[in-house]
């Protein structure tokens, strides 16, 4: 594929931006077209609620959207989409298919990898997960002293942690009758020490989530959990009732002391950051029940079908991706804010921080050459309204343009005080995108200050500070209610957005070589931290840091 910057469709888009980009003004665009909302929004109608994607508050015209869709076609998005769904090895650096869509393929139509249908294996693992969940949640699965299981400790990192953690937090209202779930990821001993201090080994089950069963952070934490358990249990054979593995390495799982019957398999075509739909989601299923886990899969499958079959110009993941391309590659935006107005989604931005930045944080193309344009953005965000009192100042009046996605459910899980809290939340959600779009003109600010009775001197002094330029782009994503089905659909929508952008940039969204170098160097440094001898084998900075740490390890603190 030709470089993006040499693609005629991209050049056409850039030329339009150079000639007209500075003239784009959202107030004027809305004034000129009273039907703008209808022209630049989509409603996705499912049998489990509706999703409105309003992208009318973006710096686009119908001509721009046509050019963006033409760019997607020129970059081969449709063909690449089919290659993914057909099980081709689109993760070309690792020689792997990319089939998280198979994990939630509720239609059960065959999906082939190397000529073999993967669906029987997918369904076999789902059945095993269902059986295990039912046994634990019903109290049939007992600990070594006969106690029912009240707590699940999920030990993993990256995709084995962020996805399940985000989903169990998001679906807390659906957890009735399930065990509590705790997540341990950080190698920092504080994380596991604080967690285990609250738990009883007799009624806890640890899930060790590691594809290879060699991930240093996960296995170190798992061994610590086993030590903690055996301090009480004394008998290594009791491990079988309290530890399960999510892995592909049967040998290592057995060596750890886990019965292979308690090992839940997944496959090399499941990427870590796309794995919550697999056995990695066992903690989700235990917490909210397997029926709700299946609803999560069904919502994602619904979005998969929308993504695969809907024309590009009406395709939610594609449109979100193209708007991102517009801002990153024409306007030069470097960050993207995800702002869910739902406290249950408080880990949503963190989840897609990995999903997006580990996928598209690349500068080498499929042909092995360095890109000559920007790729993945910095993704960040916090739930509303907390963010309004933290960083929205910069979004409104800072010097950087930050495209934002605002998300909110129409119906709350907690309609307390006759829905007052949610009404205030909705009002703030709506006000923010309007404020970012409209801003406040000098004349409007002047009238406001005059009405407040300011003296002419104070008015002139305050006036420039009270002006909002506006013209800040946002997407509003409004959905009926945060249910398992709806969450699955939203997560899949963003997954496919990331995929589309990777295709347009001609990078591999499904490897993560950038994670490896630091891990390699850490293995070399770890033994150098032993003893008190000065270290001189690195650059001056790293040597200085190591030697300071050695010196301060034994320091007495007053």
Curated annotation (Swiss-Prot):
Residues where N-acetylalanine is found: 2
InterPro entries: G6P_Isomerase, G6P_Isomerase_C, Phosphoglucose_isomerase_CS, SIS_dom_sf, SIS_PGI_1, SIS_PGI_2
Broad class of where this protein is predominantly found: cytoplasm
Pathway where this protein functions: Carbohydrate degradation; glycolysis; D-glyceraldehyde 3-phosphate and glycerone phosphate from D-glucose: step 2/4
Classification via SUPFAM superfamilies: SIS domain
Residues with the N6-acetyllysine modification: 12, 142, 454
Residues recorded with modification N6-malonyllysine: 454
Subunit and partners: Homodimer; in the catalytically active form. Monomer in the secreted form.
Protein name as annotated: Glucose-6-phosphate isomerase
Protein species of origin: Pongo abelii
Organismal lineage: Eukaryota, Metazoa, Chordata, Craniata, Vertebrata
């Amino acid at each position: 594929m030709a470089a993006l910057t040499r693609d005629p469709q991209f050049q056409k888009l850039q030329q339009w931006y150079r000639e007209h980009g500075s003239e784009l003004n959202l107030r004027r665009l809305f004034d000129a077209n009273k039907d703008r909302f209808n022209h630049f929004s989509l409603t996705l109608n499912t049998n489990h609620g509706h999703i409105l994607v309003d992208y009318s508050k973006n710096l686009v015209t119908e001509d721009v959207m046509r050019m963006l869709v033409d760019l997607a076609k020129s970059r081969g998005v449709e063909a690449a989409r089919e290659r993914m769904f057909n099980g081709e090895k689109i993760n070309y650096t690792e020689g792997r298919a990319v089939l998280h869509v198979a994990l939630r393929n509720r239609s059960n139509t065959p999906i082939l990898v190397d000529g073999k249908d993967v669906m029987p294996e997918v369904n076999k693992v789902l059945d095993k997960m269902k059986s295990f969940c039912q046994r634990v949640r019903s109290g049939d699965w007992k600990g070594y002293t006969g106690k029912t299981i009240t707590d699940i400790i999920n030990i993993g990192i990256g995709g084995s942690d962020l996805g399940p953690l985000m989903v169990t937090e998001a679906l807390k209202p659906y957890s009735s009758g399930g065990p509590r779930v705790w997540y341990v990821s950080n190698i920092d001993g504080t994380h596991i020490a604080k967690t285990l201090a609250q738990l009883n080994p007799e009624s806890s089950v640890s899930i060790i989530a590691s594809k290879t069963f060699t991930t240093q952070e996960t296995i170190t934490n798992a061994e610590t959990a086993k030590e903690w358990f055996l301090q009480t249990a004394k008998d290594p054979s009791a491990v079988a009732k309290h530890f399960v593995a999510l892995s592909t390495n049967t040998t290592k799982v057995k060596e750890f002391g886990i019965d292979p019957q308690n090992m839940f398999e997944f496959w090399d075509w499941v990427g870590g950051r796309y794995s919550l739909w697999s056995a990695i989601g066992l903690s989700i299923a235990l917490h909210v029940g397997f029926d709700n886990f299946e609803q999560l899969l069904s919502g994602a499958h619904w979005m998969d079908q929308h993504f695969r079959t809907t024309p590009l110009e009406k395709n939610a993941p594609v449109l979100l991706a193209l708007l991102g391309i517009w801002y990153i590659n024409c306007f030069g935006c470097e960050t993207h804010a995800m702002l869910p107005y739902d406290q249950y989604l408080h880990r949503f931005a963190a989840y897609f921080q990995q999903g997006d930045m580990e996928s598209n944080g690349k500068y080498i193309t499929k042909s092995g050459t360095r890109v000559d344009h920007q790729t993945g953005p910095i993704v960040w965000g916090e739930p509303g309204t907390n963010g309004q009192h933290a960083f929205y100042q910069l979004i409104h009046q800072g010097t950087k343009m930050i495209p934002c996605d605002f998300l909110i459910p129409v119906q709350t899980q907690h309609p307390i005080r006759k829905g007052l809290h949610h009404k205030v939340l909705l009002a703030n959600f709506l006000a923010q995108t309007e404020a970012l779009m409209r801003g406040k003109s000098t004349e409007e600010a002047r009238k406001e200050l005059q009405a407040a009775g300011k003296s002419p001197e104070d008015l002139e002094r305050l006036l420039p500070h009270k002006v909002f330029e506006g013209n800040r782009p946002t997407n509003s994503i409004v959905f009926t209610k945060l249910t398992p089905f709806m969450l699955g659909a939203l997560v899949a929508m963003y997954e496919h957005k990331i995929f589309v952008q990777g295709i347009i940039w001609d990078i591999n969204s499904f490897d993560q070589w950038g994670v490896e170098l630091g891990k390699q160097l850490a293995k070399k440094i770890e033994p150098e931290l032993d003893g008190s001898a000065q270290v001189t084998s690195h650059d001056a900075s790293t040597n200085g840091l190591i030697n300071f740490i050695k010196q301060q390890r034994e320091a007495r603190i007053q």
